[in-house]
Amino acid sequence: MQPDPSGSGGDGNANAKAKLAPPPVTAAGGRPVSVLPHKTANVRDHYRIGKKLGQGQFGTTYLCVDKASGGEFACKSIPKRKLLCREDYEDVWREIQIMHHLSEHPNVVRIRGAYEDALFVHIVMELCAGGELFDRIVAKGHYTERAAAQLIRTIVAVVEGCHSLGVMHRDLKPENFLFASAAEDAPLKATDFGLSMFYKPGDKFSDVVGSPYYVAPEVLQKCYGPESDVWSAGVILYILLCGVPPFWAETEAGIFRQILRGKLDFESEPWPSISDSAKDLVRNMLCRDPTKRLTAHEVLCHPWIVDDAVAPDKPIDSAVLSRLKHFSAMNKLKKMALRVIAESLSEEEIGGLKELFKMIDTDDSGTITFDELKEGLKRVGSELTEHEIQALMEAADIDNSGTIDYGEFIAATLHMNKLEREENLVSAFSFFDKDGSGFITIDELSQACREFGLDDLHLEDMIKDVDQNNDGQIDYSEFTAMMRKGNAGGAGRRTMRNSLQLNLGEILNPSNS
């Protein structure tokens, strides 16, 4: 095995937060200059970097080959220009540490090493070439409660493994589980620990992170612990059994309202034919009171998980597979479009926010106080009350320091107003509409999938889910309707914001709203 160039192997200490070495800082005391605590070899000295496998909000994953052994791995390359503040640097370093910390778990993707150069941080890890969880189920064409029980057993075993080592995943969703290979018996592996945190018993967290459908109610209420991972696994189980999420609405805010107050539906098809034991487990994983929710260990001891005779082996209704296909396809198309928009935002746009930050930060301290925010809002003509300004302040202040730093300010102001601006939607639509016909066809979607390194097995479903007039293609109005519906993907590293932070962006950038 390659020696670990990051020097960040796990030491089994659950309270590992304390050992998180801060990256070096520039002489001026500003943004860090590196993520890793010491210099590493160049990744290309050891690996040949090959084709693109996929692209996320913060990094691109490539196939890479070990020059010494010929073994194939995955290399996630994170551009340092996307790390806007100290907290972003620390997040990447923490992700590397957590991957080392969990590397002995059989269902966690194994890290091989981390490298850094002037422009990128590279994380080399085990290659999982077997595709995403839902894609495998859909490709099979049928599955049973017993098969669903086996999948949830694996997912919750990962959660239990994380919690036993003092790690909270915080972004459990089907897209973050990949099969190691295309083999029928390939193990399922958890990936993407970019939002994960070290914790110790009794710790409570307040930053709102995760992905809308899967986020626990206590996360939205800004006071949560590891129990939130069990809720997310419960959402995955619900989707596996019926093909749609338990809490659904047309907008992100609507999804959150449903999560906080909505009723679980066990009446619609196929629930009447699902076993009582499965429904009991779902209820107890999706209990809104985290103190009464099952722990990961208790889930693994539930009869539906433990006893093969309890989970029926008869095929689940084929309509569930059809829904699952649509749900998965919709996520992929929207994610591609979101990435196109994120990549198209210019330095000038962020530069404008930088100037706005400087204008409000009158003492050049690098942070905005309540008084500075109040004065800044007054200067742009806002008539908010002190109470409303305080609410905005608390919503944008991710680390609860009482001030807003540059990274928090960018995250709070560079969000939905950019996504929903007409020119950004036009630009994203044009990316897919290669021939400029005004329609996105199946061939154009196939080409886009290849450019993003995505499997294009379910292109018909991608189109069908968005195509309101059933003409077999997507026009601009259908595309924008999809983009403005409840957000299908995660908003990434600390950028899933509540409405107060969206309002902060709108108030400070009225011309962009």
From Swiss-Prot:
Belongs to the protein kinase superfamily. Ser/Thr protein kinase family. CDPK subfamily. Activated by calcium. Autophosphorylation may play an important role in the regulation of the kinase activity. Residues 47-305 form the Protein kinase domain. GO terms for molecular function: ATP binding; calcium ion binding; calcium-dependent protein serine/threonine kinase activity; calcium/calmodulin-dependent protein kinase activity; calmodulin binding; protein serine kinase activity. The keyword Amino-acid biosynthesis does not apply. Induction: By N-acetylchitooligosaccharide elicitor. Induced by UV-C. CDD domains: EFh, STKc_CAMK. This is Calcium-dependent protein kinase 24. Ca(2+) 2 binds at residues 397, 399, 401, 403, 408. Residues 1-33 are annotated as: Disordered. ATP binds at residues 53-61, 76. Ca(2+) 1 binds at residues 361, 363, 365, 367, 372. It comes from the Eukaryota. Ca(2+) 4 binds at residues 467, 469, 471, 473, 478. Expressed in roots. The gene is CPK24. May play a role in signal transduction pathways that involve calcium as a second messenger. Possesses calcium-dependent protein kinase activity in vitro.
